[in-house]
């Protein structure tokens, strides 16, 4: 076991595991912390191939955030969660570390090959619009 905490590894790993495996480690951590019985934690089959995509400005790109655009075909087929921490009007700088992310999203695919192919083209289907 690498981690059992809801934040131990960061990058929303526990949230992604809940979507992929249907097991809520965060709920169990809270239950354990307050002395409640745990909900069944079991090994289940993964529902597809999942990834977290950290959203950030492209190298050299900076300005005032206006919006993010995702190709509608990609959004409808693969994107399951989008969590933006940046809002319209915020200043955006090129990505240099985790504190520069604009948000993140979880995507689900039917195969590893499909995931690799779509993610390799992220610069084609994801646009950060700055003023």
Residue ranges and their predicted role:
Residues 33, 54-56, 82-86, 106, ...:
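Residues in well-ordered beta-strands of folded domains
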Residues 56-90:
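Glycine-rich active-site loop/lid that clamps phosphate-bearing ligands
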Residues 19, 67-74, 120-124:
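Short intrinsically disordered coil segments
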Residues 5-63:
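Active-site "cap" helix and flanking loop/linker of ATP-utilizing ligase/carboxylase catalytic domains
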Residues 86-131:
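Generic C-terminus detector
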């Amino acid at each position: 076991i690498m981690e059992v905490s809801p934040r131990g590894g960061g990058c929303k790993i526990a949230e992604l595991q809940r979507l992929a495996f249907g097991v809520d480690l965060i709920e169990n951590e809270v239950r354990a912390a307050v002395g409640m019985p745990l909900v069944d934690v079991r090994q289940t089959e993964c529902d597809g191939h999942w990834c977290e995509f950290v959203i950030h400005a492209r190298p050299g790109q900076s300005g005032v955030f206006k919006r993010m655009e995702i190709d509608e075909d990609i959004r409808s087929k693969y994107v399951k969660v989008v969590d933006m921490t940046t809002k319209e009007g915020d200043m955006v700088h090129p990505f240099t570390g985790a504190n520069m992310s604009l948000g993140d999203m979880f995507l689900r695919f039917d195969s590893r090959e499909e995931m690799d192919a779509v993610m390799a083209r992220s610069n084609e289907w994801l646009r950060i619009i700055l003023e």
